[in-house]
Amino acid sequence: MASATFLVQANTALSNTHISLSVAQTQALRSQLKTQRGILNANNINQLCAQLNVTNDALLQGLVPLASEFAVAPVSNFHVGAIVKALDESGEVNFYFGANAEFNRQALSLVVHAEQSAINNAWLNGAKKILKIAISDAPCGYCRQFMNELADAREFDILLPEQQFKLADLLPHSFGPTDLGNQYSLFNPAPQARSFNNTEVEQQLAAYALAAYVPYSQNYSAVKITTFNNGDFYGSYAENAAYSPSLSPLQSALSQLFLAGLSFDQHTVKGITLLETAGHENQAGVAQAVLASFVNLPPLELISAPLSE
């Protein structure tokens, strides 16, 4: 796969049972979402609700088809969208978009699911409590397990086009963090007071690594994707009690780049850096496997740094 490109469906309007936008309104919203990297803040949401005369939840479900447009699905051609409704640090409601991402000629287990993408978007951007998640299609078992790692797993609503559930309805008798003796969870991590003993590590990359949720491997790790003209994109490692549904830092960062409507190719990407915790490294192989799906990218820079005691 030479590149992964966000395809804007020009001259189309978003209209469904929840909301109806004109072509111009739809195009403006698409552009806004790319600029804001897949996030609508409280002001954006309130303005749209007033403009369209709809409720907050109607807007949430009505925008899911736009989330699906961010999908990069060269294998299945099946585009899935998800939007997390969550409270930020100020207690205001934001919408965090997500979509699936696939990688040609690599194991299907490397894909990013739409629910993972939306939750990752909320997590990386400071969301504190998930209230609802609206999805274009029923979540697979993998995604149900990923959601089971969340601090609010038993509380938030899962909204499908025609139905509404709690996670316990979809994942009864579940296996989660407490089964492994882990009292913490995604969005409720263990306190972090350590730092990397390497003064050459970029401060922001280190911050994303230290914010990783890694109770099972202790590999605090993050990825930075540097672009030529569109800034930097970061991703953090998010582990899961079932292990397989864990989200790698490269997948985390790539999902953020795709939500900005950017292509992952040599024309966009200037550099890719993976930071891992010395003695706990486990991400280089996965990162190289994902990158093998693409051509003419800069080489992956690997940094292994010890943590302070």
UniProtKB/Swiss-Prot annotation:
<feature type="domain" description="CMP/dCMP-type deaminase 1">
    <location>
        <begin position="55"/>
        <end position="178"/>
    </location>
</feature>
<dbReference type="InterPro" id="IPR050202">
    <property type="entry name" value="Cyt/Deoxycyt_deaminase"/>
</dbReference>
<dbReference type="Pfam" id="PF08211">
    <property type="entry name" value="dCMP_cyt_deam_2"/>
</dbReference>
<keyword id="KW-0378">Hydrolase</keyword>
<feature type="binding site">
    <location>
        <position position="140"/>
    </location>
    <ligand>
        <name>Zn(2+)</name>
    </ligand>
</feature>
<dbReference type="Pfam" id="PF00383">
    <property type="entry name" value="dCMP_cyt_deam_1"/>
</dbReference>
<keyword id="KW-0479">Metal-binding</keyword>
<feature type="binding site">
    <location>
        <position position="143"/>
    </location>
    <ligand>
        <name>Zn(2+)</name>
    </ligand>
</feature>
<dbReference type="GO" id="GO:0042802">
    <property type="term" value="F:identical protein binding"/>
</dbReference>
<dbReference type="InterPro" id="IPR016193">
    <property type="entry name" value="Cytidine_deaminase-like"/>
</dbReference>
<protein>
    <recommendedName>
        <fullName>Cytidine deaminase</fullName>
        <ecNumber>3.5.4.5</ecNumber>
    </recommendedName>
</protein>
<feature type="binding site">
    <location>
        <position position="113"/>
    </location>
    <ligand>
        <name>Zn(2+)</name>
    </ligand>
</feature>
<dbReference type="GO" id="GO:0004126">
    <property type="term" value="F:cytidine deaminase activity"/>
</dbReference>
<dbReference type="GO" id="GO:0009972">
    <property type="term" value="P:cytidine deamination"/>
</dbReference>
<comment type="function">
    <text>This enzyme scavenges exogenous and endogenous cytidine and 2'-deoxycytidine for UMP synthesis.</text>
</comment>
<dbReference type="GO" id="GO:0008270">
    <property type="term" value="F:zinc ion binding"/>
</dbReference>
<keyword id="KW-0862">Zinc</keyword>
<comment type="subunit">
    <text>Homodimer.</text>
</comment>
<feature type="domain" description="CMP/dCMP-type deaminase 2">
    <location>
        <begin position="196"/>
        <end position="309"/>
    </location>
</feature>
<feature type="binding site">
    <location>
        <begin position="100"/>
        <end position="102"/>
    </location>
    <ligand>
        <name>substrate</name>
    </ligand>
</feature>
<dbReference type="InterPro" id="IPR002125">
    <property type="entry name" value="CMP_dCMP_dom"/>
</dbReference>
<comment type="similarity">
    <text>Belongs to the cytidine and deoxycytidylate deaminase family.</text>
</comment>
<dbReference type="InterPro" id="IPR016192">
    <property type="entry name" value="APOBEC/CMP_deaminase_Zn-bd"/>
</dbReference>
<dbReference type="InterPro" id="IPR013171">
    <property type="entry name" value="Cyd/dCyd_deaminase_Zn-bd"/>
</dbReference>
<feature type="active site" description="Proton donor">
    <location>
        <position position="115"/>
    </location>
</feature>
<dbReference type="InterPro" id="IPR020797">
    <property type="entry name" value="Cytidine_deaminase_bacteria"/>
</dbReference>
<dbReference type="GO" id="GO:0005829">
    <property type="term" value="C:cytosol"/>
</dbReference>
